[in-house]
A protein has these predicted regions:
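S-adenosylmethionine-dependent methyltransferases
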Residues: 1-218
C-alpha cells in the first residue's frame, strides 16, 4: 500500500476502489476508511492484504498490547489503526504525499485516547533511517508492499535497520508474479521466514520473519 505506481490485471476487481470509503469491523470498532483512487492512486484504497493482516491480528497470535509497532507503506492506515485499537504504540508510515490522507483516516477512526499512542510519520524506504531508532520496534507490519523490484533493496535495508534480534516482522501479500517470490528469497538471506496464515478467498499469505542469529565466533 505504499505510494508507488501499481498495475492490476483484474480491472473489474478494481471497481470497489472507486468507492469513496470502505467499511470494516475490527477490534470491536466500526471503521470507515476514506478512499480516493482518482486523486491519490494506490495509497488511498484498502487492499485485500490489509484486510487479511487485520484478520490475522485479531486471531491474537501476536501480542500487541504495549508493544512498539511500526507499519510500512500504510496507505489508508487500516492496519496501523487496528493495531492501535489493540493497544499497541504505533508509528504509521508512508511517503510524504500520502501523509495528509493517512492522518485524516487515523483521526476519523481512532478514539481520542487511542490517538495519543499513534504517530503518523514520513518514511521512504532506505532514506533517512537515522530518524528511526535502530532495532527500536517490537513488531513491523507491512501489507501489500513487496510488488516493485526497485523497492526490494531499500525495503530490506529498512527492515534491517528497524529490527532487533527479537523484532517480529509480519508481511501480508498476494503472490502475483515471480518477482514476489524473488523478494521472499532475498528476505530469507537476512531473516528466518515462515508462512503463518493464508486466506483462501482473497488469496493472501501472511509471513512472519525475524532476523537470523549472527554467529559470534566469526
Amino acid at each position: 500500500m505504499a505510494l508507488v505506481p501499481y498495475v492490476e490485471n483484474s480491472l473489474p476487481a478494481l471497481s470497489k476502489f472507486h468507492n469513496s470509503s470502505a467499511q470494516f469491523r475490527f477490534a470491536n470498532h466500526d471503521l470507515r476508511l476514506a478512499q480516493d483512487w482518482k486523486k491519490h492512486g494506490v495509497a488511498a484504497v484498502v487492499w485485500d492484504a490489509a484486510v487479511v493482516m487485520c484478520m490475522y491480528l485479531e486471531l491474537g497470535k501476536v501480542d500487541l498490547k504495549g508493544k512498539e509497532v511500526i507499519e510500512l507503506g500504510a496507505g489508508t492506515g487500516l492496519v496501523g489503526i487496528v493495531a492501535a485499537l489493540m493497544d499497541a504504540k504505533v508509528t504509521i508510515t508512508d511517503r510524504e504525499p500520502a501523509l495528509d490522507f493517512l492522518s485524516a483516516n487515523v483521526k476519523a477512526n481512532l478514539p481520542q485516547d487511542s490517538q495519543v499512542s499513534v504517530t503518523v510519520s514520513e518514511l521512504t524506504w532506505g532514506e533517512g533511517l537515522e530518524r528511526y531508532p535502530a532495532g527500536g520496534f517490537d513488531i513491523v507490519l507491512g501489507a501489500d508492499i513487496i510488488y516493485l523490484e526497485n523497492t526490494f533493496v531499500p525495503l530490506l535495508q529498512t527492515l534491517d535497520h528497524l529490527c532487533s534480534d527479537t523484532t517480529v516482522v509480519l508481511l501480508a501479500c498476494k503472490i502475483r508474479y515471480e518477482r514476489d517470490t524473488n523478494f521472499l528469497g532475498m528476505l530469507k538471506k537476512q531473516f528466518s521466514v515462515e508462512e503463518v496464515y493464508y486466506e483462501n478467498q482473497r488469496d493472501i499469505h501472511v509471513y512472519k520473519a525475524w532476523k537470523l542469529k549472527q554467529r559470534r565466533d566469526l
